[in-house]
Design a protein with these regions (language model features):
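A short, small-residue-rich loop immediately preceding and capping a beta-strand
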Residues: 63-86, 92-100, 177-185
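Phosphate-binding loop/pocket of nucleotide- and phosphate-handling active sites
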Residues: 273-324
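Redox- and metal-dependent alpha/beta enzyme cores, enriched for Fe-S-associated oxidoreductases
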Residues: 205-235, 241
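Positively charged, low-complexity intrinsically disordered leader regions
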Residues: 1-69
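Gly/Ser/Thr-rich loops at beta-strand to alpha-helix junctions
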Residues: 75-83, 105, 158, 181-192, ...
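Active-site-proximal loop->helix
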Residues: 83-130, 215-227
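Active-site-adjacent helical/loop segments in soluble small-molecule enzymes
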Residues: 146, 232-278, 283-287, 295
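Small/polar-residue-rich loop-to-helix segments that shape phosphate-bearing ligand pockets
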Residues: 102-175, 233-256
Length: 324
């Protein structure tokens, strides 16, 4: 349950203690599980919250002094990135904008929870006509120029993100030989690989279950440029999920699994690897599914989107004129 009225606020002491906590290892259905989904900021959970918080912390002086005290991010409708960024902004006392594809207010499903939570955290929600992620990303770029805000991209400082995740490998048992996890951007699993080397773990193979080609891009951009002494000695075996990104996979598991992300990696693991404590599932997090959080969005529109709207209206008027 998210407590909006008594939400944590930033202090150096709280931040350093909170972000350096090691999340636990548990057992589920015969597999070991790294419960990074239990990392929590006032009810918003998961390892991505830690990544975003550290990214903002590392740039906090710049954001306050050079970016008008604000951050913004672009996100797809199913992505928890909008909620996470807004929650982190509230924690640090920053202004926040998010850009997402515009949708009608009558739609009520789990995909609409993130934008409503963003608004509840105080973010302004900017709607974009282009439903593909390229639409919000372009709008975010335009809004950076318009507002001066600092743009949050989880892949913008890949080395720092990987290092943040790598530190969580410290409490992985020495008998773990195989690690499985979901790969959206892929930085989480690349960070796990980095951590296995950092803490001299006995892991032989890591299976990132990919939802897109982003992991290959980020591996080339961030991981492959590491010094040989910082790279995982075992096999980094990328496998493609049989499910598309937009597909919701609902598994009958007592372990809470995100339907867009973690469930697909868990499904691959159970179909391909026999239960063993030597196999560890890396659970990054789970987004909020409670539909009671949904509220009407007070949509904002960037100057860029308003120009696009005017151009579309002009073309439509021209078509009507030509027809008659």
């Amino acid at each position: 349950m998210i407590n909006f009225d008594n939400f944590p606020t930033f202090s150096e002491e709280h931040f350093n203690t909170w972000t350096n906590e090691l999340t636990p290892i548990q057992e589920h259905k015969g597999y070991s599980v790294k419960r990074d989904d239990l990392f929590n900021l006032g009810g918003v959970s998961g390892g991505k919250v830690r990544q975003c918080s550290k990214l903002v912390y590392e740039n906090l002086d710049h954001i306050l002094n050079e970016c008008n005290g604000g951050i913004l991010t672009a996100a797809g409708i199913p992505s928890p990135q909008s909620c996470i960024t807004s929650a982190v902004a509230k924690y640090f006392g920053l202004k926040c904008l998010i850009t997402i594809p515009h949708y009608p207010s009558h739609i009520r499903d789990s995909y609409r929870v993130n934008s409503s939570l963003s608004q509840k955290f105080g973010a302004k929600v900017y709607g974009v006509g282009n439903p593909n992620i390229s639409g919000p990303e372009l709008d975010a770029k335009k809004l950076v120029g318009q507002t001066g805000y600092f743009q949050i991209k989880f892949g913008m400082n890949g080395r720092q993100v990987m290092k943040t995740i790598a530190q969580q490998v410290k409490n992985i048992p020495d008998d773990i030989e195989t690690i499985v996890g979901i790969a959206g951007s892929g930085l989480s699993m690349l960070g796990v690989a980095m951590g296995c080397k950092m803490y001299n773990k006995n892991v032989k193979v890591i299976h990132p279950v990919a939802l897109s080609g982003y992991i290959n891009k980020n591996k080339k951009t961030w991981y492959d440029k590491l010094k040989p002494d910082d790279k995982f000695d075992g096999e980094f075996h990328i496998v493609q999920s049989e499910y598309p990104y937009q597909h919701k996979l609902k598994l009958d598991e007592s372990l809470p699994l995100d339907q867009t992300y973690e469930a697909k990696a868990w499904d691959w693991m159970t179909k391909n690897l026999k239960p063993s404590k030597k196999v560890l599932f890396w659970d990054v997090g789970i987004k909020e599914y409670d539909l009671d959080y949904i509220e009407p969005i007070k949509w904002h529109k960037s100057e860029h989107e308003m120009i696009i709207d005017r151009e579309l209206r002009r073309k439509n008027e021209q078509v009507k004129h030509d027809f008659f």
